[in-house]
């Protein structure tokens, strides 16, 4: 893949819908639902997102139709390579924005949430420009590795959440509760 404009938005053009998609992809990721890995159970996703299991069922079927998840009845759901690509692109943008904000003097504790909120509105093209202007940073302000989205695969995917110290509670526009 070239480092130009990646087609990661897919059918996620509306902000609200895209935000919901990112919430589900993040929840599945946090429950170890990586490509070729474990399956995240609907009930655990429902608890994490504070929605009903039937809502999870409906949304994951939609994600499956978009090619973002693999869904196995009575097993659960896990990300496809395409779903991982969309999620990793979002988290990479967030990390780049964290670096920019930290260099601009924003308190490191505020960078994380601000970066996540701003990442949804940042185009792929603009993110690559920022990445280059910032000197292709290797670490976020929290000293976690930044992995460009074109270098993410199922083997190193576990590191992307660490890039921003991500927690499901920091995804913008959420109604999420801490996992129990």
Swiss-Prot record:
UniProt xrefs under InterPro entries: DtxR_MntR_Metal-Reg, Fe_dep_repressor, Fe_dep_repressor_sf, HTH_DTXR, Iron_dep_repressor, WH-like_DNA-bd_sf, WH_DNA-bd_sf
Keyword field contains ATP-binding: no
Sections of the chain in a coiled coil: none
Pfam families (UniProt xref): Fe_dep_repr_C, Fe_dep_repress
GO molecular function terms listed in the Swiss-Prot or TrEMBL record: DNA binding; DNA-binding transcription factor activity; protein dimerization activity; transition metal ion binding
Occurrences of domain HTH dtxR-type (ranges): 17-80
Gene3D superfamilies for this protein: Winged helix-like DNA-binding domain superfamily/Winged helix DNA-binding domain (1.10.10.10)
Keywords: DNA-binding, Transcription, Transcription regulation
Domain of life: Archaea
Keyword Transcription found: yes
PANTHER family in the record: IRON (METAL) DEPENDENT REPRESSOR, DTXR FAMILY, IRON-DEPENDENT TRANSCRIPTIONAL REGULATOR
Family membership noted in the UniProt record: Belongs to the DtxR/MntR family.
Protein name: Uncharacterized HTH-type transcriptional regulator APE_0142
Organism encoding this protein: Aeropyrum pernix (strain ATCC 700893 / DSM 11879 / JCM 9820 / NBRC 100138 / K1)
């Amino acid at each position: 893949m070239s480092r130009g404009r990646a087609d990661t938005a897919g059918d996620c053009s509306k902000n609200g819908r895209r935000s919901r998609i990112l919430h589900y992809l993040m929840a599945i990721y946090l429950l170890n639902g990586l490509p070729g890995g474990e399956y995240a159970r609907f009930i655990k996703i429902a608890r994490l997102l504070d929605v009903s299991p039937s809502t999870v069922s409906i949304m994951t079927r939609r994600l499956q139709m978009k090619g973002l998840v693999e869904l196995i009845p009575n097993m659960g759901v896990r990300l496809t390579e395409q779903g991982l690509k969309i999620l990793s692109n979002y988290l990479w943008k967030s990390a780049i924005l964290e670096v920019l904000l930290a260099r601009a003097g924003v308190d490191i504790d505020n960078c994380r949430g601000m970066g996540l909120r701003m990442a949804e509105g940042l185009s792929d093209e603009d993110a690559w420009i920022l990445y280059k202007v910032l000197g292709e940073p290797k670490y976020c302000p929290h000293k976690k590795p930044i992995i460009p989205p074109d270098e993410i695969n199922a083997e190193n995917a576990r590191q992307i959440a660490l890039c921003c110290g991500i927690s499901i509670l920091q995804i913008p526009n959420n109604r999420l509760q801490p996992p129990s």
